[in-house]
UniProtKB/Swiss-Prot annotation:
Entry's Gene Ontology BP terms: brain development; negative regulation of transcription by RNA polymerase II; nervous system development; neuron differentiation; positive regulation of DNA-templated transcription; positive regulation of transcription by RNA polymerase II
GO CC terms, sorted: cytoplasm; nucleus
Top-rank taxon: Eukaryota
Organism lineage string: Eukaryota, Metazoa, Chordata, Craniata, Vertebrata
Function: Transcriptional activator. Functions as a switch in neuronal development, participating in the differentiation of embryonic neuroectodermal cells into neural tissues by making the ectodermal cells responsive to FGF-neuralizing signals. Downstream SRRT target that mediates the promotion of neural stem cell self-renewal.
Positions of the UniProt region annotated as Disordered: 1-41, 230-259
UniProt protein name: Transcription factor Sox-2
Subcellular location: Nucleus
Residue spans binding DNA: 37-105
Length: 311
């Protein structure tokens, strides 16, 4: 109730017109004011005055801008003889205008449009190259970057038959594909690289494990023996199930050969149980290791795989 009384007692505040409305109002006043002096008509305006009225009567729904376009096209098609009377009339009107308004000076009005059409659609930040050379260099640079990215993806895919080993390559710090750095081959020799063929074979054996449901035993080792081996690769020999990661071979040579009998026995004896385990279990495991050893010495199957006769 009190708020209603306050609003009734307060006088209404005078509304101030905005800047755009005030400018348009002043322009309309200048146009309609009798003191404003118009420019004298030129020959085209003299000719189009009658033609515009005629065309507007014929096409009442046509916009004024479209009428102006058509009148301009028709004026250009007229010959000099047809334009001559309108040119003379424009000269007479100009002389009369100068006589009536000797102090008249044409002052063009400021245009309200701030952005031109071509400035409106230009890309910000100079994204377009200023010259052809810069444009070609930019295109070449982006094309080269795309090729390098594509080669990197192929390098990640090469040497791995299963898609699950793609992350393993980044974790092990494997260098880029040898085909990319063929000219840097002497410099990359001291670096430890992994045997691509061994990794390929082990991934195939793991896929066979997934399909058949039975573990397979891979015996792909290099000639350097136990000091170059990692614990993961030695554990894959004794365990009955294949590990998820392929064995890491730190040798730079890509040749493979079956391990000697003594080295294999030393590696297996490292994992044999001590005195706390019953003797029967130890004897059975020793018998199993001797079976693997004899199978590796006697003969291997296709691609170095062992026969599954013990299963």
């Amino acid at each position: 109730m009190y708020s209603m009384m306050e609003t009734e007692l307060k006088p209404p505040a005078p509304q101030q017109p905005s800047g755009g409305n005030s400018n348009s109002a002043s322009n309309n006043q200048n146009k309609n004011s009798p003191d404003r002096v118009k420019r004298p008509m030129n020959a085209f305006m003299v000719w189009s005055r009658g033609q515009r009225r005629k065309m507007a009567q014929e096409n009442p729904k046509m916009h004024n801008s479209e009428i102006s376009k058509r009148l301009g096209a028709e004026w250009k098609l007229l010959s000099e003889a047809e334009k001559r009377p309108f040119i003379d009339e424009a000269k007479r009107l100009r002389a009369l205008h100068m006589k009536e308004h000797p102090d008249y000076k044409y002052r063009p009005r400021r245009k309200t449009k701030t952005l031109m059409k071509k400035d409106k659609y230009t890309l910000p930040g100079g994204l377009l190259a200023p010259g052809a050379n810069a444009m070609t260099s930019g295109v070449g640079g982006s094309l080269g970057a795309g090729v390098n990215q594509r080669m990197d993806t192929y390098a990640h895919m090469n040497g791995w038959t299963n898609g699950g080993y793609g992350m393993m390559q980044e974790q092990l710090g494997y260098p880029q594909h040898p085909g990319l750095n063929a000219h840097n081959a002497p410099q990359m020799q001291p670096m430890h690289r992994y045997d691509v063929s061994a990794l390929q074979y082990n991934s195939m054996s793991s896929s066979q494990t997934y399909m058949n449901g039975s573990p397979t035993y891979s015996m792909s080792y290099s000639q350097q023996g136990a000091p170059g081996m990692s614990l993961g690769s030695m554990g894959s020999v004794v365990k009955s199930e294949s590990s998820s990661s392929p064995p890491v071979v730190t040798s730079s040579s890509h040749s493979r050969a079956p391990c000697q009998a003594g080295d294999l026995r030393d590696m297996i004896s490292m994992y044999l149980p001590g005195a706390e385990v019953p003797e029967s279990a130890a004897q059975s495991r020793l018998h199993m290791s001797q079976h693997y050893q004899s199978a590796s010495v006697a003969g291997t199957g296709i691609n170095g795989t062992l026969p599954l006769s013990h299963m």
